[in-house]
Amino acid sequence: MKPIKEGKVREIYDNGDSLIMVATDRISCFDVILNNVVTKKGTVLTQMSKFWFDLTKDILPNHMISADVKDMPEFFQQPQFDGNSMMCKKLNMLPIEGIVRGYFTGSGWASYQKDGTVCGIKLPEGLKESDKLPEPIYTPSTKAEIGDHDENISYEQSIAHLEKYFPGKGEEYAAKLRDCTIALYKKCADYALSRGIIIADTKFEFGLDEDGNIVIGDEMLTPDSSRFWPADVYEPGHGQPSFDKQFARDWLKANPDNDWTLPEEIVEKTINKYLQSYEMLTGEKLQ
């Protein structure tokens, strides 16, 4: 059986009226797939997404049918698929990523330093790197194909972008994505903080199910799609240590002649951070 689509990290298989989504151990940074594999990373991504899908279904349904390979075709009942595979509903994916920022970091901080705005949103003067924002802000982006870069856009641009693909629905879908993105973030950020983790920012992907309802697709609140900071050492005014792939990003930035290959010790530290975040958030050891 061959995947019908290979993303930066995931492989997608057609299962008739559903899809099987397999999270590989590949790692991507700056929209580039690195040459390394990070053992168990795919399992962390799948099991963490499952955890959040279960926690947030009262806010918005999601595409997960089952994360148990026993519910999947025989081909997937092999060790390499156990734990990192999810059977999902087929969705018509929306061409916008719902990005939400609760703290000042990354490209949002860089933009603010230039002109005091983030994706066209004017923010108060005097904010510091890693500050908690007065309210979470929604900064959508377009979705790039492999090799291209996602593009941050304004809310108004997201309406126009959605309108191109779904005539007559741009405003409705843009508002729903914004409102759901912020509601999901608030609930999950509060929960994570109670477990000792700050969710600085994250992104969600959405699609339409067979009845035309907007549901959450792809992954949810993983170390690949989010910035997780340890709450016990949080101190605004500078960058924060993290439980996500920021560790790998920082090494790549500091070593520009890297040929997109991480040293083994960086790979090991990266997976340890992924595992630690999973255990802190769920209260369970990864099986």
Map each language-model feature to its residues:
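Conserved metal-phosphate-binding beta-hairpin within the catalytic cores
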Residues: 100, 199-220
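Intrinsically disordered, low-complexity acidic/polar segments
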Residues: 30, 109-110, 211, 225-227
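A long amphipathic alpha-helix within ATP-dependent nucleotide-binding catalytic cores
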Residues: 168-200
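Active-site loop/lid in soluble adenylation, ligation, and acyl-transfer enzymes
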Residues: 1-145, 258-287
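Anionic ligand-binding catalytic core segments
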Residues: 114-118, 122-172, 216, 220-281
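Coil-to-beta-strand transition motifs
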Residues: 18, 93-95, 195-199, 211-214
